[in-house]
Amino acid sequence: MKKYYILPLFVFFLTISFSQKKKNASEELKSSDLTGLKFRSVGPAFMSGRIADIAINPNNENEWYVAVGSGGVWKTVNSGTTWNPIADDQPFYSTGCITIDPHNSSKIWLGTGENVGGRHVGIGHGIYVSENGGKNWKSMGLKNSEHISKIIVSPKDPNTVFVASQGPLW
């Protein structure tokens, strides 16, 4: 009885192992596809490059903002092909959250200080806002909170902003 089960299983697995479509030369990755990408450091900490938060512009799906745990804030205008740091001149390097104002997609809210507890954690300097898509930043307070985990702009009132903060770890 077992012989009858083994043969169909063998035929089935043999069939699916050869059923993949062969790649065309035009489908293969070429070095020219990667010309816009360059290797670069994304942070100074032991575990750099940790994405803390991401925000995508609801009015332009190609424009993204990324808050990096130990690497500042990055922006892309081409869906991630290339990235530019947009807060390197600020007094913080650790970020925890980033939010696009639902009333004005050029207004970006940033919570500094990654909201984790570990040897790699970086403290922040409160909340910052940019009125021009990340070109300039203004401190809005809560400097002693050190770790901002979430910012929500009220959908009814752009002047009401809710903030969640862990507070100092030590």
Where are these regions (language model features)?
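Beta-propeller blade termini and top-face loops
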Residues: 18-170
